[in-house]
Amino acid sequence: MQPALKQGYAVPCFNVFGYEDALAVVKAAEARNASVILAVNLDMTLFMPLEHIIGMLKPLAQSATVPVCLHLDHNYDIPTVIKAIDAGFTSVMYDGSQLPIAENIAGVKQVVEHANNML
């Protein structure tokens, strides 16, 4: 994603709900020789174990001929967010917006500390 930042262009992000969606997005990105972000939303994590999701999407991303970012989108469950970091998601979004501000900040801090320990 660094080339996009340096060269000032956007990278599209698509919510995917299964392998077929993800494959179609990656194939379209490859046809355009464009980077892409595959976003996994909360609904997908409620119906499929995170380990299965990463097992399905990570090989697809790694075998793509263009850069593919795996993003866990708007997830409010800290253990799930941490599990996603450990499993190899490129980015995560912890969403504590429904919590009191102090709890939200504490949750963000916990996720950031864990992510920084992975560097």
Language-model regions, residue ranges each:
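N-terminal amphipathic alpha-helix/helix-capping segment at the start of soluble metabolic enzymes
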Residues: M1-P12
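Structured helix-beta-strand junction loops
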Residues: Q7-G8, R32, M118
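Hydrophobic faces of well-ordered beta-strands that scaffold small-molecule active sites
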Residues: V11-N15, V36-V40, V68-H74, V92-Y94
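Glycine-rich, positively charged N-terminal anion/phosphate-binding segment
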Residues: Y19-A64
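Active-site-adjacent beta->alpha loops and helix N-cap segments on the catalytic face
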Residues: E20-L23, L46-I54, H74-K83, S97-L119
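Glycine-enriched alpha-helix->loop->beta-strand junction motifs that scaffold or abut catalytic
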Residues: R32-A34, D86-V92
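Short beta-strand/loop segments at the ligand-binding rim of alpha/beta enzyme cores
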Residues: A64-H71, M118-L119
